[in-house]
Amino acid sequence: MDDSLKTITRDVLEVITPEELMDVLKKDEPVVYTGYEPSGRIHLGHALTVRKLRELQDAGFRVKILLADYHAYLNGKGSMERIRELADYNQKCFLALGLSPERTEFILGSSFQTEPEYTDLVYRLALITTLLRAKRSMAQITRESRDHKVAEVIYPLMQVIDMVYLGVDVALGGMEQRKIHMLARENLPRLGFDAPVCIHTPLLHGTDGSEKMSSSKGNFIAVDDSPDEIREKVKKSYCPMGETEGNPIIEIVKYFIMPEYGMMTIRRPEKFGGDLELELDELLEMYSSSELHPLDLKNAVSDYLVDMLEPVREYMEGV
């Protein structure tokens, strides 16, 4: 169990609470859930949580992925027809990223979110949730707008009740999900249900250096991009000399390449110091001190990403 806990908590920002997670790990097949809005290309930001889902699966969890079509609709991501088309594409991408088809359940939100019992629970939750609390929980999820819609406060209430319907032991998400997860932990016990354990992963910065990688902003590397597209996007990515914080290229190294390989080879001409074999701490130190040039790092990251995402491209071409 100690090894499982170490793997599950690696590269996460917080677990609420570690003690409760230990209890969950004693179950035969606990359930971890993540919800995704089908609203665009699947990119490295999604792959960050999928990697953690794979680790949880290896630790004995059953994975439930909510393809949140109604949530995407409430968040202004397009027509239901288009959203459902994207849900099918999303499912293929998640399997291509290595989730076990036997131990992964994909659930379309609209398959249960209009049932009377579900609606009744949403109403009961609405009665004990303040308007301010519901609005605050959506601050990092809704699109920027001055013309706010009532849909923005329905969204978090539905997400909380989703956890009841899916029999969730652990809710996994990026830090933008934290306030909704805390709403679930606070109010589900008041409705007679157990509070989920919450695991929060970092948000991957966009290739333009903005706070979050997003398909709607175009600042992403898709998991099914071609090798040429990957190289071009990495080449153009924000990667300031000597800066590691908020640097998407450094984050790709930290959260994708190093966990997979443990060490990274940086190819450089002899006149610029020759090739390097670096562990994460060494790479961060060299980059922080400007001993490692952004272009050399980008070239190496491109090579690794092209290699790592090749199985995804092959899978997607075959389905």
From Swiss-Prot:
Function, as annotated, reads: Catalyzes the attachment of tyrosine to tRNA(Tyr) in a two-step reaction: tyrosine is first activated by ATP to form Tyr-AMP and then transferred to the acceptor end of tRNA(Tyr).
Q: What is its main location?
A: cytoplasm
**Naturally occurring in which organism (per UniProt):** Methanothermobacter thermautotrophicus (strain ATCC 29096 / DSM 1053 / JCM 10044 / NBRC 100330 / Delta H)
Q: Which family does it belong to?
A: Belongs to the class-I aminoacyl-tRNA synthetase family. TyrS type 3 subfamily.
Q: What are the subcellular locations of this protein? A: Cytoplasm
Instruction: Give its E.C. classification number.
Output: 6.1.1.1
- In the UniProt record, the signal sequence range is none
GO CC field: cytoplasm
- Catalytic activity as recorded in UniProt: tRNA(Tyr) + L-tyrosine + ATP = L-tyrosyl-tRNA(Tyr) + AMP + diphosphate + H(+)
Motif 'KMSKS' region in this chain: 212-216
> What is the residue range of the motif 'HIGH' region?
38-46
Cross-referenced Pfam families: tRNA-synt_1b
Subunit arrangement?
Answer: Homodimer.
Q: Where does L-tyrosine bind?
A: 33, 155, 159, 162, 177
Q: Which GO terms describe its molecular function?
A: ATP binding; tyrosine-tRNA ligase activity
Q: What is this protein called?
A: Tyrosine--tRNA ligase
